[in-house]
Amino acid sequence: MVSAPPTLQDQAFRSLVRNEVLTVSDAECLIREFFPPLFKEASTQKKPKTIMILVEHWPYPCLHVGLLIDKPNFQIFQAILDGVDTWLKRKYRPRMGRLKKVDFRDAQHHASLDMQDEREGRDYLVGTLPKKQIVEDHSRTRKERLKLFHDLSFMSSLHEDKHQTLLLEWAKERTSFLHLCCEKLEIGAVEVSKVRNVLKFLQPELIKELKLNTVGNLSKLAKFVPFIRKMRNLQKLMLVRTFGTRTFTQEEKQNISKIISLFCKLSCLRHLTIDDVYFLTDQMKELLRCLEAPLVSLKITLCQLSQSDLESFAQRWNYSQLKHLCLRGVTLTNLDVTPLRDFLKRVAANLQTLDLEDCRMDDSHFRTLLPALIKCTQLTSINLYDNDISEDVLENFLHRTTNLSQLTTEMYPAPSEVYNESNYVIVEIFIQICSELMNKLMEVRQANSVCFGSSSCYDCDNRYLYEDDGDVTLCLCQE
């Protein structure tokens, strides 16, 4: 597609920025609608001086950096902070007094806002403010602190983010003038004391999403519990990679109890992910009992569950709004999945996605689950890869999926008959059986995206895939 030639206004903006002729007095008289395009152009041309002047005189209540420019370089980032700094130090702000918020979060974040928040978040693009905003601007005192939004990540002490390091040092010195607001926080295997010092000047009630990756250290995870308790509006929690021995010391038992009891305080929690966490075994009953708010998504991956853990799913807890369930990598080989079947029946009316990949189920497990699976009529996605299911059992399931018409993504394991004694795929049999199963499915209902996949190849770690259009993807060893 041929792009439209630049307008005279575009050319004027480029020239103005390129020659760096914008002065403070010019900015004070500049039409407010010119600020966003000039800001974008100054970022494109990497003109920090112009950026600083535009920020200092920003005429809108919100400066959404993340919507205007994608990942500013370090020089531009520093210029934005310098502009904010100059704005904060101004004694009188007749025009500039409108600025209430500087937001570095990216466009993806703003795309997820609801309509009301989105309208407020895009005030810098319109010529007039909502009446409610105008009234509030006159009623607020000048002592109100500026809010600066930025997601924070402490995932690696070896590769620190220069932008974030600068921001934290800058914000720490200006806590009397601004609030550093973080809605998405990631904490990895860094020094606990370092992160705790940062948490002290954040507003915990603003944090909505938290990822904790303590890389095997249970005591580190437990030390964060007092801070997490204060995150009363936390909606999404991810506990990742905490592993150790199956024999707990007294101190470890106390830490586990402290972590599990935390869930009683998270009354807004809607999305929970527990990935590769060793202490979860025999703790599911207490954890689920502690949940106050109804979960929308529950993801438990690479964890070892006991029979009592599985039974706890079918007991009383707040699952009335559950739409997404993932048990990927949870080995069910030696467990009775009847409680899981009963649980799936109870959430069938709402469940939209189900991921049971690599649960190591066989025909007996699948036969047990089948009556529940066919009742999940709202499913849009199902993943059953890496389960040892025969052709007959899989065909029986597909034949009974008439009511699963909402499915848009279906991933099924290649039947056990496609493997030889060494568990390698026999390509001709793979293609033949998968083709027959696909035809059986098409006789039952119209499918959107269906794929039969083998287990990963021992040599290249890729799958054989048979898709609904008849396309066959061989593992790299066969190509």
UniProtKB/Swiss-Prot annotation:
LRR repeat ranges per the UniProt record: 96-124, 179-203, 204-230, 231-265, 266-291, 292-323, 324-347, 348-375, 376-400
Any idea what a deletion of this gene does?
Embryonic lethality due to a developmental arrest during the establishment of the blastocyst.
Does the record carry Repeat as a key word?
Answer: yes
| Biological process annotations from GO | blastocyst formation; negative regulation of apoptotic process; negative regulation of cell differentiation; negative regulation of DNA-templated transcription; positive regulation of cell population proliferation; regulation of ERK1 and ERK2 cascade; somatic stem cell population maintenance; stem cell population maintenance
Coiled-coil region: none
The record's annotation in InterPro entries points to: LRR_dom_sf, PRAME, PRAME_domain
Q: Specify the superkingdom.
A: Eukaryota
Q: Which UniProt keywords apply?
A: Leucine-rich repeat, Repeat
Q: How would you summarize where this protein is expressed among tissues?
A: Seems to be specific to pluripotent tissues in the early embryo. Not detected in somatic tissues.
Q: Looking at the keywords, is rRNA-binding present?
A: no
Briefly state the protein's biological role: Promotes maintenance and self-renewal of pluripotent embryonic stem cells (ESCs), downstream of LIF/STAT3. Maintains the pluripotency state of ESCs by repressing DNA methylation through the regulation of UHRF1 stability. Mediates the proteasomal degradation of UHRF1. Is required for the establishment of the blastocyst.
Which PANTHER family does the entry link to?
PRAME LIKE 14-RELATED, SIMILAR TO PREFERENTIALLY EXPRESSED ANTIGEN IN MELANOMA-LIKE 3
Similarity comment? Belongs to the PRAME family.
Q: How does it assemble?
A: Interacts with UHRF1.
Name assigned to this protein: Preferentially expressed antigen in melanoma-like protein 7
The organism named in the record is Mus musculus (Mouse)
**Gene name of this polypeptide:** Pramel7
